[in-house]
């Protein structure tokens, strides 16, 4: 609303007149005299709109004309403002509210190497019967004062941090070698997150000295969060000490599939995630699940001869030991190759065993956030091939991570894709939906696997109470006594794990004691 001031003069008998022009001096007849009123042109909002439009257009001369008492360096101040922020564009618009106490808010949107938006304020005053901007450096930005300037400064960004589950940074030179292997794997899977970047910050400066960073210094790149548990990792690394053959250990949280530890010794090749090995008798967890689903009960009597011809090929137990007739649970605990080979031919077919293997993740791409291989179960070609597959030999291949997830499935009741990296878009990542196992199968295996530790092939190993597992001796190569990889997989509570020693021999003698050291360190 236009403002007015005036005085009342004594009554005179003269004709009122109107001065129409810039001054707008208006006579107003009132009782007892005439009020001579001076009206201010326009409104604060109109002046603000003209000023902000000129600022957007970089028309500093027009802006100066709308300012009450503009300083000598007015135009230069605005050019320095634009240059300091390295702007490629800027818009200034009045906000929705009208003037209040002579102040009008405006919205600034600056475009440059780092965009900036803020709300500024114009203070309007009456000067020479019109509305003018009362200008100070704070008119350009609320935090500007005499002697201060705004600058956009570009610098190298800090490398992205990789964090363990507890927030500890793990991508530094002091990190264990196995953890560094995982970091290198993440660089392959998430190259954009590790690329060298430059970061622009906007700050207040006094001369060349920074006073305050306004934006762009929010702690750098968002860190990469992992599921690694450093306590579990240290226990695994300690358990592997002194092993004179290549050895790997993987630990998972069974209920979620979270990878807690991946340890390889020596370093170089990440065999825990990328190695493909015959799983040997650890695969009997899968075969036993198929047999139980087909009607076999843990207490059912079965034959376990020392040697059995299946499809024209001789299968034998470790040391050709003959157990005669025993329960299915005992056959599992003592790892009877002849029992599982013959029963797979008599009661299963390749398609059915393959179906159950797939329910444990075989054939499923593994995308935990670092490169990892999938477990392989090719369709058996004949009875001999099926019997070999049933005991984890032949063409069946798996990594320690794959077999740890098999143990985790029994512990939790569902196979869950393992994962290491949280909150990132992993290329080709499969849905993390758990695949529930049959309840009867889970219940049976939860009696079979503890029996391995209490009464079977691992009964001489000092495991902590509550451990369930399966030994494996996976032959490879050729000859009458071919070399073998040593395996042990298992779980205790919500912790599932696997251990492999390349060329280590019997799982009960080599891999199982390593697993026991690992679990005892956590107990």
Can you annotate each of these PLM segments?
Residues 247-275, 290, 294-507:
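Beta-lactam-recognizing serine transpeptidase/beta-lactamase-like catalytic domain environment
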Residues 17-26, 30-55, 60, 415, ...:
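C-terminal region of N-terminal signal peptides and the immediate post-cleavage residues
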Residues 18, 83-248, 256, 485:
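Extracytoplasmic/periplasmic proteins that interact with beta-lactams or build/remodel peptidoglycan
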Residues 45-53, 61, 65, 168, ...:
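Solvent-exposed, polar/charged alpha-helical surfaces in well-ordered, non-transmembrane soluble domains
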Residues 39-46, 50, 55-103:
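Short solvent-exposed beta->alpha transition segments
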